[in-house]
């Protein structure tokens, strides 16, 4: 099994789309608050402090768009950002953070699971993995949930500037995908060096509805 490789072209690299300014449009702390924008949605999910909000800020060229904190568990609701009325970017709460009450963790779990299972407009899920930590059990559970609900996803290794050799990560991803019998993009991104930002934008731009 091989991962797909995105080769951005002038028409698909996402530069035109991400030239527009994204804006925060809604936050949902429970399932009843989840909005329906009737636009394609792409979601970012991963462990707490994996860099979801920072990555959204990087690809949108706005360091103040999604709130960023060095404290794990800061994102406590689903945040929705509108990009040019063409795409909704969804920042999900992180999972696996221990230093919150069990009731809060359960609430986040219900919220994340419900959104991933039920969002009608969800087109692509970006499963973020910390390059320094590798794929953990919680990540595998999320991947299982996505496959069970026929959700398309791609693996994004964050903080790639913190590791010197991507081969071990590549092999780990390949073995993981083989166990799932699934093939998808595997990317390496760094908010500091901007590595992988162009390829990621290209994959997201493909989720836009075609012009009629």
UniProtKB/Swiss-Prot annotation:
GO terms for biological process: division septum assembly. Keywords: Cell cycle, Cell division, GTP-binding, Magnesium, Metal-binding, Nucleotide-binding, Septation. Gene3D superfamilies: P-loop containing nucleotide triphosphate hydrolases. Its cofactor is Mg(2+). Residues 38-210 form the EngB-type G domain. Mg(2+) binds at residues 53, 75. PROSITE patterns: G_ENGB. Disulfide bonds: none annotated. CDD domains: YihA_EngB. InterPro entries: G_ENGB_dom, GTP-bd, GTP-bd_ribosome_bio_YsxC, P-loop_NTPase. GTP binds at residues 46-53, 73-77, 91-94, 158-161, 189-191. Necessary for normal cell division and for the maintenance of normal septation. Belongs to the TRAFAC class TrmE-Era-EngA-EngB-Septin-like GTPase superfamily. EngB GTPase family. This is Probable GTP-binding protein EngB. It comes from Rickettsia africae (strain ESF-5).
